[in-house]
Swiss-Prot record:
Keywords: Transferase. Involved in degradation of indoleacetate, the most common member of the auxin class of plant hormones. CoA-transferase that catalyzes the succinyl-CoA-dependent activation of phenylsuccinate to phenylsuccinyl-CoA. Acts as a rather unspecific CoA-transferase that shows a broad substrate specificity for C4-dicarboxylic acids, including succinate, (R/S)-phenylsuccinate, (S)- and (R)-benzylsuccinate and their CoA-thioesters, indicating a fully reversible catalytic process. The active site is at D171 (nucleophile). GO terms for molecular function: CoA-transferase activity. It catalyses: phenylsuccinate + succinyl-CoA = 2-phenylsuccinyl-CoA + succinate; phenylsuccinate + succinyl-CoA = 3-phenylsuccinyl-CoA + succinate; (S)-2-benzylsuccinate + succinyl-CoA = (S)-2-benzylsuccinyl-CoA + succinate; (R)-2-benzylsuccinate + succinyl-CoA = (R)-2-benzylsuccinyl-CoA + succinate. This is Phenylsuccinyl-CoA transferase. Homodimer or homotetramer. The keyword Metal-binding does not apply.
């Protein structure tokens, strides 16, 4: 695919994750941050979260989503800053403009689709917000959206409190939707020559994943079917985490055939009473089955139980911690990497899908405003003009 140019006014995680996926393809990604405000740290607040890696504005939490990107700083509160942005769109032949600020700021900052598309009609514009442009003031924080979209209601023990997922899934889902819909927009542009606007509502994107619960409301479901149930599956029995002599193991029975194979394992033969032969029958005895399963698994090491399940083709997995996940051969050989300015190799998460020709190593994140001067020169600004813009607070870096 042709290398594209993405200019992204981004912060936090949702949009940086989307543009990371473009950077992983070898596209040019320029992250646009604000100029310093009175009394505040400059740029994306995430720059200053976590342990110091090489300097104060490139800390651990900021690194992985922002590798492979350039960084510029423009004051979009000023008309001259907005004019500068529009010039960059043309001079750099920007394909995609992204932002993840609250929609009420679009026109205030001159980044709304109508304004930018008048400057560059073939521009693809993508914005992430909490609930879309109809709710212009709603803040889009992942934990808030997990609560709002019912995810916390569905996560945790049945008799425990609502629980946050261990991964910022709404942020990442929103970023994936930007990635996918930009690709669709590029295909459409190739046919029509026209740009388009993409609005990703984090709430709508999150609700689209409620495919196993939300539709049940029109089928007179029981309350237990649409609330949290710990590690158990609401429909398939037994599917759960069980204790072993040295840890835990997860196993899933998804059919009556798999149940029969389970009860043919000598250790589990005592569970195979006739009423349990069907999933419907097992559902009626689910609490007893979970107790019976745990009574067996707790007597044996995880590796021994896993070997039995593997021989019987029962879906299962140990409960890995994050170091163990990274050490899995299927993951380890696909890890992306970056290098700190002093040459230290840093291993990061793999790409979602292997892409032929994609580089596994991406440049270390740029310092705040590191590329402002170079990008402005590329857009035709002389050094004297750049210095004047800096003195007036229109740019930084």
């Amino acid at each position: 695919m042709k290398r594209r140019t993405v200019l992204s006014m981004e912060q936090a995680l949702s949009m940086p994750y989307a543009t990371l996926r473009f950077a992983q393809l070898g596209w040019r990604v320029i992250r646009l941050e604000s100029t310093p405000s009175r009394g505040g740290l400059p740029g994306d607040p995430n720059r200053y979260i976590g342990a110091n890696v090489v300097d104060d504005d490139r800390r651990t939490y900021f690194i992985a989503p922002n590798v492979g990107k350039e960084a510029i700083a423009i004051n979009l509160k000023e008309p001259d800053g907005q004019a500068l942005l529009r010039r960059l769109l043309v001079e750099l032949d920007v394909d995609v403009f992204c932002c993840n600020t609250v929609p009420r700021r679009y026109e205030q900052l001159g980044i709304d689709y109508e304004t930018l598309s008048r400057t560059k009609p073939d521009l693809i514009w993508a914005g992430i917000s909490a609930m879309g442009p109809d709710y212009p003031d709603a803040p889009g924080y992942d934990p808030v959206l997990q609560a709002m979209a019912g995810y916390m209601e569905l996560t945790g023990d049945a008799d425990g409190p609502p629980t946050l997922a261990g991964v910022p899934i709404v942020d990442l889902k929103a970023g994936d939707e930007v990635f996918a819909n930009v690709m669709l927009a590029l295909l459409e542009r190739a046919e029509t020559g026209k740009g388009s606007r993409i609005d990703v509502s984090m709430l709508q994107a999150a609700a689209s994943w409620l495919i196993t619960t939300l539709p049940l409301l029109d089928f007179d479901c029981q309350p237990a079917e649409i609330t949290r149930c710990g590690n158990a599956h609401r429909k398939f029995i037994p599917t759960n985490v069980y204790p072993t002599a040295d840890g835990f193991i997860y196993m899933a029975i998804g059919s009556d055939v798999q149940w029969r194979r389970l009860t043919e394992i000598p250790k589990f033969a005592s569970l195979g009473a006739a009423p349990r032969a069907t999933n419907e029958g097992r559902h009626k005895e689910r609490d007893a089955i979970h107790r019976d399963m745990a009574a067996v698994t707790t007597r044996f090491a995880t590796a021994e139980i896993a070997a039995d399940f593997r021989d019987a083709t029962i879906p299962h997995a140990p409960i890995h911690d994050i170091p163990a996940v990274r050490d899995m051969e299927a993951v380890r050989r696909r890890l992306t990497t970056t290098r700190t300015p002093d040459g230290r190799l840093v291993h990061m998460q793999p790409m979602a899908v292997d892409v032929a020709g994609a580089s596994g190593e991406l440049a270390f994140p740029a310092k705040y405003g590191q590329d402002t001067c170079a990008v402005l020169r590329e857009a035709g600004y002389a050094d004297e003009a750049i210095a004047q813009l800096r003195e007036r607070g229109i740019v930084a870096g």
